[in-house]
């Protein structure tokens, strides 16, 4: 969208309502619920890790801008897309597999090819947000969706709400 309007996109923001004493995971597009970070906040954390200039990403299952604006992600297939940036010494790549129906489907194989980073070796750090990683909402549902969680449950939810580093490869 920024490209189509020739805007220099420097960051991501959100717009949300926040009301005190609301049920857990009630909505309002907020980034946290009762002090526990929601999975969407981890997306913003990943945006914050991206450095340098945005570079082109292509794929055979990415929705185009017009489809996103006109009808969001409602076709028979998921939007398997990405966002990437690079500077002189690093590259960051964010890949997603998303559909508005919010139904868990099998993982899609993804191949990432990075060109133009002059190095013979690299360290790859992987972060994941899915039903098992960086997702306080899924943990809360597995707890039985408590509206009055115990201190112990809140501690577990707080940990699950953080962006989880899944692997580091050299």
PLM features: what roles do these ranges have?
Residues 24, 32, 60-67, 146:
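Solvent-exposed, non-transmembrane amphipathic alpha-helical segments
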Residues 36-43, 48-81, 108-112, 162-170:
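Feature marks hydrolase-like catalytic cores characterized by long aromatic- and Gly/Pro-rich stretches
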């Amino acid at each position: 969208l920024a490209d189509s309007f020739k805007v220099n996109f420097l960051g991501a923001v959100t717009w949300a309502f926040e009301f005190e004493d609301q049920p857990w995971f009630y909505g309002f597009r907020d980034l946290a619920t009762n002090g526990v970070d929601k999975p969407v906040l981890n997306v913003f954390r990943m945006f914050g890790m991206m450095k340098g200039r945005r570079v082109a990403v292509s794929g055979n299952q990415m929705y185009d801008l017009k489809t996103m604006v006109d009808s969001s992600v409602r076709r028979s297939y998921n939007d398997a897309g990405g966002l990437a940036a690079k500077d002189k010494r690093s590259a960051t790549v964010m890949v997603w597999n998303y559909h508005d129906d919010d139904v868990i489907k099998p993982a899609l194989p993804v191949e990432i090819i990075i060109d133009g980073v002059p190095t013979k070796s690299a360290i790859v750090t992987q972060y994941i947000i899915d039903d098992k990683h960086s997702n306080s909402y899924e943990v809360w549902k597995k707890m039985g969706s408590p509206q009055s969680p115990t201190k112990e449950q809140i501690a577990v939810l707080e940990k699950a709400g953080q962006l989880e580093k899944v692997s580091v490869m050299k």
